[in-house]
């Protein structure tokens, strides 16, 4: 059974914030890795018989070029931040606000000045690369922009490219794992500080703001995503937003949040109890904890050689079976987990819609089963885990306890 713990963790229990030397080492590691990253993309381009790749997602641009255009949100880049890769060149499109930054961060790239009228410069861009067929991030480029580019250079064929860079980013390099680990430690310390200050009568917004302050002053460059702080029945909203609702004794308090460190993100959910847990919520917590343990145990068994490496769908099924057996299958609608890195949601997907292929390695993903009773209560427990076939066990990167914790009293 999950322990009921009355003592609370201390921020000093967790890894210290990254140092300047850590960040310098990560920058060097990225620079050394980029030629290999670009080669993999160019191999895909050659296999698809395309002359260039047109990308617009900010984390893809950072991964391939080093140019950082990121405000802490997963997003599609604007006109500054679009890029082209050919067999010989990398071209960054940047307006006057970012030219100096792009030149410094991506020294091997050609920087092209752009305005908000990309179609106007598109013909000369593709001509300068000798491109007759261009692969385009089809899931991200709008129908409108696709049509504009076709009309601007009708002699250039646009080809849909789906998941080309994502497929490479799912396998994490050592320096990427280090940064995710550091982001997890920032989150661990921040929550350890906040749980000591929770009191009945505080609002969700007050606690979310306090947690954000701890994250930003504790070594993070930004939030990984907007904080969810949900009290009582609001915890039944898997992606709810903080409100003026107050914390009350006898109810749950759910935090879902993450830190971003040098571009890489963490993601953690903890469900706490204000005072003594009521029997219903405590029982639900036990089920969710058992479901998470079952999924991680399935991963562990593969690394020990007891079972084959599971697919994302199988890892999800292990957690889902526990919740369904407890009679709450209809109260667990989302997937068990998702990959994470430069974006909050990446491959692999641990869900009923996940791939049937064995999970890649090494990779980092969340394991986050939950049970949600509409208008009543909700419980989710989320950890990031490192799945690495070279290891003997799955490593939890988020280390804040998953025991039943009572706070606010």
Where are these regions (language model features)?
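Active-site neighborhoods and metal-handling regions in enzymes and metal-associated proteins
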Residues: 1-409
């Amino acid at each position: 059974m999950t322990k009921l713990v009355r003592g609370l963790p201390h921020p000093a229990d967790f890894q210290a914030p990254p140092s300047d030397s850590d960040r310098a080492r990560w920058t060097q590691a990225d620079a050394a890795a980029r030629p290999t990253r670009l080669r993999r993309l160019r191999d895909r381009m050659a296999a698809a018989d395309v002359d260039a790749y047109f990308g617009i997602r900010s984390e893809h641009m950072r991964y391939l070029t080093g140019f950082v255009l990121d405000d802490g949100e997963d997003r599609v880049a604007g006109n500054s931040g679009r890029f082209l890769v050919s067999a010989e060149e990398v071209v960054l499109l940047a307006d006057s606000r970012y030219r100096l930054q792009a030149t410094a961060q991506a020294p091997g790239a050609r920087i092209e000045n752009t305005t908000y009228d990309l179609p106007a410069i598109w013909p000369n861009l593709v001509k300068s690369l000798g491109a007759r067929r261009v692969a385009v991030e089809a899931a991200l480029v709008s129908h409108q922009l696709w049509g504009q580019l076709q009309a601007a250079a009708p002699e250039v064929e646009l080809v849909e490219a789906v998941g080309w860079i994502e497929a490479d980013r799912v396998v994490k390099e050592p320096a990427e794992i280090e940064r995710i680990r550091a982001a997890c430690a920032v989150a661990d310390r921040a929550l350890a500080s906040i749980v000591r200050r929770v009191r009945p009568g505080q609002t969700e917004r007050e606690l979310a703001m306090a947690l954000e302050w701890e994250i930003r002053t504790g070594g993070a460059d930004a939030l990984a995503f907007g904080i969810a702080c949900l009290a009582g029945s609001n915890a039944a909203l898997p992606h709810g937003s903080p409100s003026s609702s107050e914390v009350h004794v006898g109810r749950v308090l759910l935090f879902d949040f993450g830190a971003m460190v040098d571009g890489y993100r963490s993601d953690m959910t903890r469900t706490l109890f204000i005072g003594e847990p009521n029997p219903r919520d405590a029982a639900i917590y036990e089920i969710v904890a058992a479901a998470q343990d079952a999924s991680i145990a399935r991963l562990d068994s593969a690394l020990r050689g007891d079972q084959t490496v599971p697919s994302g769908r199988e890892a999800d099924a292990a957690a889902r079976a526990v919740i369904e057996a407890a009679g709450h299958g209809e109260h667990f609608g989302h997937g068990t987990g998702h990959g994470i890195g430069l974006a909050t949601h990446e491959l692999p997907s641990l869900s009923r819609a996940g791939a049937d292929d064995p999970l890649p390695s090494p990779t980092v993903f969340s394991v986050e089963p939950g049970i949600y009773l509409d208008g009543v209560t909700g419980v989710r427990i989320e950890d990031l885990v490192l799945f690495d076939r070279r290891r003997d066990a799955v490593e939890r990167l988020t280390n804040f306890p998953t025991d039943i914790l009572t706070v606010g009293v």
